[in-house]
């Protein structure tokens, strides 16, 4: 039950973030719903394609889709009311979603007997793939590739799950907590990976 609750928090966070980006880009109501749904479920869809799970399995998550649609509707109807609280709790909710989705993606891949590399990729795509698709559809540079450390924490979760270091559910919850704390610290202290800017002069 607790794991389902964490997934719901993640779905709400991702759906809301997609809807907010769509409204920032002045998309119409259809665009708001599409970007919200893609952000919440896009990473899982790509993961399923790569690890051999039928994409149609996503349609079995009817309750999650309803939650996402309701969240997007609330954002669209009452943006100011929600954003007042979103600025305070949005990053934490997003961190919860990242950790929960990354671990779930890794567990999917392990269950299907995939190698470690596939487990890590599944974790990264499930945790951050939706955000990447959201930014690309909005014509933005993917934030997860240039802002505070984000996808790395999903990869770390996939690595630990793939190596089989967690023997029970308690271990998974410990990993979840660690990933959430790491992500929260990333945006609180502006942790970033090294980067190098290069422009070719004409």
UniProtKB/Swiss-Prot annotation:
Pfam families, sorted: Gly_transporter
Recorded superkingdom: Bacteria
Subcellular location: Cell membrane
Protein keywords: Cell membrane, Membrane, Transmembrane, Transmembrane helix
Gene Ontology CC: plasma membrane
Main location: membrane
UniProt keyword annotation of Cell membrane present: yes
Keyword Membrane: yes
Membrane topology: Multi-pass membrane protein
Spans through the membrane: 3-23, 26-46, 63-83, 90-110, 113-133, 160-180
Protein family according to the UniProt entry: Belongs to the UPF0126 family.
UniProt cross-references to PANTHER family, sorted A to Z: INNER MEMBRANE PROTEIN, UPF0126 INNER MEMBRANE PROTEIN YADS-RELATED
Protein name per Swiss-Prot or TrEMBL: UPF0126 membrane protein YvgT
Organism, scientific name: Bacillus subtilis (strain 168)
Gene: yvgT
């Amino acid at each position: 039950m607790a794991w389902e609750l964490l997934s719901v928090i993640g779905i709400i966070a991702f759906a809301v973030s997609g809807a907010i980006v769509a409204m920032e880009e002045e998309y119409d109501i259809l665009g708001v719903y599409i970007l919200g749904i893609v952000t919440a479920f896009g990473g899982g869809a790509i993961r399923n394609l790569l690890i051999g799970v039928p994409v149609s399995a996503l349609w079995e998550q009817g309750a999650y889709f309803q939650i996402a649609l309701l969240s997007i509707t609330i954002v669209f109807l009452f943006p100011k009311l929600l954003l007042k609280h979103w600025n305070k709790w949005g990053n934490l909710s997003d961190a919860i979603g990242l950790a929960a989705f990354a671990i779930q993606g890794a567990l999917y891949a392990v269950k299907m007997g995939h190698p470690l590399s596939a487990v890590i990729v599944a974790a990264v795509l499930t945790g951050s793939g939706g955000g990447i698709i959201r930014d690309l559809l909005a014509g933005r540079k993917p934030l997860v590739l240039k802002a505070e450390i984000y996808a790395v924490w999903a990869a770390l979760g996939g690595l630990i799950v793939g190596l089989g270091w967690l023997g029970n559910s308690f271990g998974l919850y410990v990993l979840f907590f660690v990933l959430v704390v790491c992500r929260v610290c990333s945006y609180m202290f502006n942790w970033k990976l090294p980067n190098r800017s290069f422009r070719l002069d004409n």
